[in-house]
């Protein structure tokens, strides 16, 4: 049974009865046999979520796709088989001849006949191309598809004639005929181009500003290639890289910016993203066209780093810029070193900006006086410590930590056997606003604990 279905299907293909088609209207077109929708799927949210809107065309009638529901075609072929004479070798040769006939011969003949009516000089051909672009644009706005096709052939004839009577190599390099005509017809930077023109302009959708580059697509003046670039790097976009490519075609009664606006709104609903930090830093260093850099308000080309105080070329002697990836326990020390170096660097820069007459030599701090002997009548320290007790550091095990004396800490854990406690700094947490506009914790002292001996702490009274 399956072999019979395959034979009937192959005979229909050989006879030219069966071929693949596309679904033009997903909501109304139904199968001729079963009556179901040819494409019973909703609008996809991402690429290839559902099968493509294809169907089978048999004797001019549309049926369900053969891969999804092959019974429809099989039932129709059983009731309407292919005549045997349609599958003879002679019929196959006629079908092959019809399919192998070069479809470009008629078009080349039309283009050659049309080119014979065009001017011979370069300036005249450029003017013809510009007029054809304007005619295509008006035809699209007036929904005159046939007029747009005629104007498109006139544009192609100008390219064909300027290229020496052939399309071969007409877009090979920047000096080729098609590239020369595209530059001549290009729209003014910042102005929305017409259909058939190349150019770039600024689009805005729900607060998202987009630099739109428009180039010619594949298929004539009514196809277009949109290149979307992020303008404000700290805001949402339709791609994590700050760039998105999209091919589209003209729609009757709509301008280029209206089509781009619809595409951007659809992409923003389905793929709203913030830029990746690496791509944001890369784009922040790239220059913008003059017309785009002068818009109001100006483009926000901020880096992903919240605070970037690096100036490697201006570091004074004794400082060096280091990028490092460290474990968490070592990164804590590196951050403390960086904070100390940042403060010293800021002081050095401020001193360098002072007039020479106002500079003051640094005052050498006086040596700390020796600690007085402990007073025997002083209040005794508590015999035990407990979690949550606020204590003051009174001594350290090495002079390098002398600046820690007097700092207050909060005890979290106790080890009576070793007469040690674990405590964190008595400081409030710090917060900041990240590039996504969210409040995040920048520093929490409770996450960093140190070990102290009983004799190093005193209860803060």
Swiss-Prot record:
Region (Disordered): 84-107, 349-379
UniProt keyword list: DNA-binding, Plasmid, Transcription, Transcription regulation
Positions with biased composition (Basic residues): 91-101
GO molecular function: DNA binding
Induction remarks: Expression is decreased in the presence of KorA and KorC.
Keyword Transcription: yes
Domain of life: Bacteria
Compositional bias of kind Basic and acidic residues: 357-377
Notes on the domains: Contains a DNA-binding region joined by a short variable segment to a region similar to E.coli korA and trbA.
Name of this chain's protein: Protein KlcB
Native organism: Escherichia coli
Classification lineage: Bacteria, Pseudomonadati, Pseudomonadota, Gammaproteobacteria, Enterobacterales
